[in-house]
């Protein structure tokens, strides 16, 4: 919890139910009942009642006013103590049952008798925090089907050398579209993107990754519109204006006025230019080629980064084997599930924590 939201803890997202459900590409409808009974406003009221002042930022993201995730975890610990909840610092090995009902949790140190157990072990992302995937093993041993875990909200790997050449470059206010092998758009949004040594990352890419669920036998490309505020005709006029104002300058200089400096050589090469051409020597066809690259900067995606680098784990306990109104197991009486151990996942922005609170 203390590392969420870059250490600030994006507690929830202050949006309506429809927006919330639309932000959960992984089995969002299964969560309808839970998110109706415990809404983002309920989450905010809960923490404010515990003494944590909250604020709403861009994109309706909710954070502690202090910008410290520790305020959230400290408040939860205080509430546990107030309610005299017993802490057992142990590792659960398995859940014991008798006649199809929970009887105890067996740990490494002791056994803990119980008539009801909530399995809230999270996924397999961020293994350095202790996420081992034990919950999947425990649930599977009790007869539950586990949808194979994979990374969601994860950076994406691109083919070629263009991304390494632009490593560290962050683009704002760009439009991104991801196409599958049939040239069908599977994701489209506007925002920020980051080039890395392996490919692309940033908020837009992380959200896009949640939609890319089939990599075997599928081919994805990501198209970046570097000038979404201008259509091709207006962008062509903008390029023509820049050339007219600086006819004797090299195209490398002109391009650096259109895109960040480290991106200019890549854009020019894709347009069939070297950058040494005089601006006034550019033909109409060359200018149009440049506009096409600016509006349709395309990269081939080869796959996601490892699940250990993902913000969220997709996959987990199959939701068809869980009662949506109670999160109770349909296999074992007294067994319940909460959070990321279930096969549910959402976009970045506080949605995944809201799922955790609601379930």
Model-derived features: positions:
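Glycine-rich loop(s) and the adjacent beta-strand/alpha-helix scaffold that form part
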Residues: 116-162
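An anion/pyrophosphate-binding glycine-rich loop and adjacent beta-alpha core
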Residues: 3, 17-18, 53, 144-150, ...
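Flavin (FAD/FMN) cofactor-binding core of flavoprotein oxidoreductases
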Residues: 62-69, 152-161, 304-321
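Glycine-rich phosphate/pyrophosphate-binding beta-alpha loops
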Residues: 125-127, 155, 201, 312, ...
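Conserved N-terminal/central alpha/beta ligand/cofactor-binding core
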Residues: 2-86, 91, 195
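Core beta-strand elements of the Rossmann-like FAD/NAD(P) dinucleotide-binding domain
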Residues: 88, 106-116, 188-191
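A conserved short coil-to-beta-strand element within the FAD-binding core of flavoproteins
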Residues: 88-101
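A glycine-rich dinucleotide-binding beta-alpha-beta segment and adjacent secondary-structure elements
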Residues: 88-91, 265-345
């Amino acid at each position: 919890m203390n590392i969420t939201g870059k250490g600030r803890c994006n507690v929830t997202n202050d949006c309506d139910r429809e927006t919330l459900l639309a932000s959960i590409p992984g089995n969002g409808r299964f969560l309808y009942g839970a998110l109706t009974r415990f809404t983002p406003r309920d989450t905010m009221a809960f923490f404010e009642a515990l003494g944590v002042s909250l604020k709403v930022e861009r994109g309706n993201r909710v954070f502690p006013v202090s910008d410290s995730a520790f305020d959230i975890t400290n408040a939860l610990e205080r509430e546990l103590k107030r309610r005299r909840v017993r802490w057992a610092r142990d590792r659960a090995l398995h859940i014991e049952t008798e006649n199809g009902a929970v009887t105890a949790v067996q740990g490494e140190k002791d056994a803990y008798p119980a008539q009801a157990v909530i399995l809230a072990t999270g996924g397999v992302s961020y293994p350095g925090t202790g996420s081992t995937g034990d919950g999947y093993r425990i649930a599977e041993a009790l007869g539950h089907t586990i949808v194979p875990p994979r990374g969601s909200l994860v950076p994406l790997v691109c083919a070629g050398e263009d991304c390494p050449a632009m490593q560290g470059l962050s683009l704002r206010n760009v439009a991104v579209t991801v196409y599958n092998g049939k040239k069908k758009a599977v994701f489209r949004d506007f925002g920020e993107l980051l080039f890395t040594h392996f490919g692309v990352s940033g908020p837009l890419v992380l959200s896009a990754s949640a939609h890319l669920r089939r990599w075997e036998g599928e081919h994805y490309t990501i198209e970046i519109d570097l000038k979404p505020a201008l259509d091709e005709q207006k962008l062509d006029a903008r390029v023509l204006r820049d050339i007219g104002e600086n006819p004797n300058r090299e195209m490398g200089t002109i391009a650096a006025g259109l895109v960040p400096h480290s991106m200019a050589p890549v854009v020019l090469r894709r347009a069939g230019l070297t950058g040494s051409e005089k601006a006034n020597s550019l033909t109409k066809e060359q200018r149009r080629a440049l506009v096409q690259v600016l509006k349709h900067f395309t990269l081939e995606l080869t796959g996601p980064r490892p699940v250990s680098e993902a913000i969220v784990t997709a996959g987990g306990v199959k939701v068809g084997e869980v009662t949506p109104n109670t999160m109770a197991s349909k296999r074992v009486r007294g067994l319940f599930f909460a959070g990321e151990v279930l096969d549910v996942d959402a976009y970045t922005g506080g949605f995944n924590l809201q799922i955790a609170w609601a379930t």
